[in-house]
């Protein structure tokens, strides 16, 4: 956990490519051998942080029935509440210092969820649904980034 927190701290200040294992271990006050006993490299550590958040996001999405408008609105509210509980990690992983892999993973999860749940309900053409999903997902992620960067100045409701 301390290595994950230390990497997130460093990502607030500098680009991922500029961070070294030595620097991370000094901040975390652990030996490099301890780091390498758990991770292949810094990108492996970053991927584990991202995957943990993505797994939680998938759990949130799977609890809602997107076909019912009321539940779709509740789902959006719950997602924003989830982001609020993981604000620091999400803000850091979606900033310009991190690589784009986390945003891409979030986009993929959201796209799959929309295609699985929305296309069938609305009986839309797959090709049209792909474009519509890309539009919705991109806009939603930009809105979430803006909301987080503005200190979550609006209520999830």
Label the predicted regions.
Residues 8-12, 58, 84, 115, ...:
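Short amphipathic alpha-helical interface segments enriched in basic and hydrophobic/aromatic residues
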Residues 16, 88-89, 119:
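Generic structural signal for secondary-structure transition and capping sites
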Residues 19-20, 91-93, 156:
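Short, hydrophobic secondary-structure boundary micro-motifs
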Residues 97-123, 127-134, 138-141:
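Amphipathic alpha-helical packing segments from all-alpha helical-bundle domains
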Residues 1-8, 12, 17-21, 26-29, ...:
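An amphipathic alpha-helix adjacent to DNA-recognition modules
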Residues 60-64, 90-93, 121, 147, ...:
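Secondary-structure edge/capping motif, primarily at the C-terminal ends of alpha-helices
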Residues 137-138, 146-157:
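C-terminal peripheral helix-coil segments that are non-catalytic and often amphipathic
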Residues 69-115:
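Helical hydrophobic small-molecule/effector-binding pocket
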């Amino acid at each position: 956990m301390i290595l994950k927190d230390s990497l997130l701290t460093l990502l607030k200040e500098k680009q991922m490519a500029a961070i070294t294992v030595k620097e991370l271990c000094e901040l975390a006050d652990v030996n490099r051998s301890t780091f390498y006993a758990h991770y292949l490299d810094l990108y492996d550590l970053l991927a584990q942080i991202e995957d943990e958040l993505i797994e939680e996001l998938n759990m949130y999405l799977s609890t809602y029935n997107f076909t019912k408008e009321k539940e779709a609105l509740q789902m959006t509210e719950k997602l924003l509440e989830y982001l609020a509980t993981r604000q620091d990690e999400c803000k850091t992983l979606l900033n310009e210092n991190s690589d784009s892999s986390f945003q891409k993973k979030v986009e993929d999860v959201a796209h799959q969820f929309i295609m699985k749940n929305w296309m069938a309900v609305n009986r839309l053409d797959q090709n049209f649904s792909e474009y519509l999903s890309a539009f919705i997902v991109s806009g939603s992620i930009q809105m979430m980034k803006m909301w987080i960067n503005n200190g979550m100045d609006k209520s999830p409701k």
